[in-house]
Swiss-Prot record:
One MF annotation (Gene Ontology) recorded for this entry: DNA binding
CDD domains per UniProt: RNAP_alpha_NTD
Subunit structure: Homodimer. The RNAP catalytic core consists of 2 alpha, 1 beta, 1 beta' and 1 omega subunit. When a sigma factor is associated with the core the holoenzyme is formed, which can initiate transcription.
Gene name of the record: rpoA
Domain comment, as recorded: The N-terminal domain is essential for RNAP assembly and basal transcription, whereas the C-terminal domain is involved in interaction with transcriptional regulators and with upstream promoter elements.
EC numbers: 2.7.7.6
InterPro entries for the chain: DNA-dir_RNA_pol_insert, DNA-dir_RNA_pol_RpoA/D/Rpb3, DNA-dir_RpoA, RBP11-like, RNAP_asu_C, RNApol_insert_sf
Entry-linked NCBIfam families: PRK05182.1-2, PRK05182.2-5, rpoA
Function: DNA-dependent RNA polymerase catalyzes the transcription of DNA into RNA using the four ribonucleoside triphosphates as substrates.
GO cellular component: cytoplasm; DNA-directed RNA polymerase complex
Protein name: DNA-directed RNA polymerase subunit alpha
One Pfam family linked to the record: RNA_pol_L
Amino acid sequence: MLKIEKQAKAIKITEVKESNYKGQFIVEPLYRGYGNTLGNALRRVLLSSIPGAAIKGMRIEGVLSEFTVMDGVKEAVTEIILNVKEIVVKAESSGERRMSLSIKGPKVVKAADIVADIGLEIVNPEQVICTVTTDRTLDIEFIVDTGEGFVVSEEIDKKDWPVDYIAVDAIYTPIRKVSYEIQDTMFGRMTDFDKLTLNVETDGSIEIRDALSYAVELLKLHLDPFLEIGNKMENLRDDIEEMIEEPMDIQVIDDKSHDMKIEELDLTVRSFNCLKKAGIEEVSQLASLSLNELLKIKNLGKKSLDEILEKMKDLGYDLEKNGSPE
């Protein structure tokens, strides 16, 4: 097993919750750089791709557009629409549904006054919709749909709607905030590892752990096809697995070899060119590389790797021990 794989098996996740809908996930230890890689990927997926429900249209009895003036109602229609956008809806299944309210004033109309279809739930019933100041009646119908992200009212398909329905900006994403921080952490005696702290807050329609789990599943679905590309890395890993050992022995070398140029190693042209293109000019540079770092050199194949290891061993350097001599 490669060193990075051993380290990956040691990763732990700690959940620090303020509530079911707000908290932190602390992930450590991560290989250097993986904190940003995972943090950025998870943040983008959480913000863009977690499905949710939202009101995308509404009909107010007697109102033909958002610019209509309503008698006996304190707020303008445009303000009512803004308030309706803040209503958080939870849906048990996907698809378009209906909700409605019918009240008689005077009254402060809230989301709690809405009668929802089976399978729909109002998460924030205290959200104010409008204030009716007279004894007039107010009837409103709502269209609820499911989706991802945010869809502005101009992009909502209204071709099958009655003329008096008004489109509403649909905030489908249940994620309110996502941020992440990277700090140094230890793994064994090494301190150059990442600790990822992922801060997540939802609108209350989904728990943070469910949102994160779904984001990971989405990422996995998009990465799975890459596993079919080939098994070259798997074969290479099998070839070198037995060569990697944890203990590092102290080796005795000739001090003069440390200042040698790689030209003096008498390598084949392919091996020499790979090292030169990687910016390796001297034996001292080569001696400082671990086996994993050698494997990352572009176009360096198994035969070239074996040749370099053998040449360095002749000089007293055993790079198979994953380090350079003291």
